[in-house]
Amino acid sequence: SLRCVKTAEEIARMREVQMYNEEATRAAVELIRGSEIDEHGGLIREDEPVTSERVRDVIAATLRPYACEERDTIISCGTDTAMPHCLGTGQLRAHQPIVMDVFPRNLKTWYFADMTRTISKGAPSEEIIQMYEAVHEAKEMAAAMLRPGITGAEVHNAVAAFFTAKGYETTGASGFIHSLGHGVGLEIHEGPSLSPSGGILEPGNVVTIEPGLYYPGTGGVRLEDMGVITNDGFD
């Protein structure tokens, strides 16, 4: 696809949207960080429950002055985080993973941005902590591999092998169960892909890296950054 290679102007537009995305995500994190824990383990702030819906409202309100909109923002908590596409609903809980996947679109330029963070109010289980550390290491490893000439498949498969070596599943309904990443532009999912069928990457490709681990009954962890393939790496 001709759209796979972005111009300098397109890249600048997408960096701008990602900057607003980062601001909105920070506002969401601050809402949760400033919350208290009620007697049932739920999060409250200013005597009101901190819900998935409330967090989405904060994100939307932060993006609105920049002519950006969010749709289907994922704010999931607890065992819901084991389902990558679960939007999340209701009161967030302490000591549980909270996955925030925010992908706004600028309504003036029509370009998207994309990022995901996993946080917790209060220490989560040791299992979730270990999953987080593995996902973070996988993301950093993938970023270091990205460069012109490598294939999306090579990077995806390297991350899968890394998770396997750590003792996590990579072939079934648990563990690492989705592609490592995807292109972003005028669509939130476009070419090129970091997947088992991903082709050769070239300068100007804008892609996400979003490794994740998911275990029903336990929860999930996903981290996602967006960047551009440069002449000698990934920025």
Regions found by a protein language model. Name each.
Residues 1-235:
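Active-site neighborhoods and metal-handling regions in enzymes and metal-associated proteins
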